[in-house]
Amino acid sequence: EQLLLRWDIEGDEAIPSEAIKALFEEAKVHLDKATAVILSDYGQGVIVEEGVKTIIEAASQNNIPVIADPKLTGLHHTHGVDWVIFQANGLELMRRRLCVESGDDAAHLLIKNHDWKHLVVVCGAAGVTIYSADGSSVHAECTLTDLRQMIGLVDAAVVAIAVAISEKLGVSHTAQLVNAACECILAASSSDSFVLNRDDLVDRIGEMAWNLQVSKR
């Protein structure tokens, strides 16, 4: 199944600054109940620089990790966050903009420039790679041979990272969990009716573990 055309109609009017301020103030009130903060920016809505900065600072003061799914033109909104998610084509675009030789070089330079802790790159058939501020990287290979669709890949990765944070998983296990969530999306027969849930994720991890055991890896 392939999505050939999508037409989203949104209002062009800017959201009143009073409303944006109220939303961010309300979000700050509930931070103490949060395991993680997720920022998803598609260039519309309430992701504005001052508000995002306030949330990131408040989360940092409360030791709450921040996960960001940024628009490439809005990376300045993500300075100092813990987890940032790119798709492979996004990293390649940034590699060209930064004029570096490899995606690895681009990833580590982005981490340094924006003070991120981790950059997660989801690559579909090429699996998942997590780059970290200490210069290390971890890769989880995709185990699927039949990839059906990719819609919702980044959303699945965000959910998996949030789960990994709540379970206090290390980077290596987080990469495996993100890869499992992405494989659930890649193997889905229909993007419209599929919803990632706990059972699907557990089943996928079980299949991955079995495949690794069979191949003795």
Regions found by a protein language model. Give the residues of each.
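Conserved phosphate-binding/catalytic loop of the ribokinase/pfkB sugar-kinase fold
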Residues: 1-31
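Non-cysteine beta-strand/loop elements that form the S-adenosyl-L-methionine
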Residues: 81-89
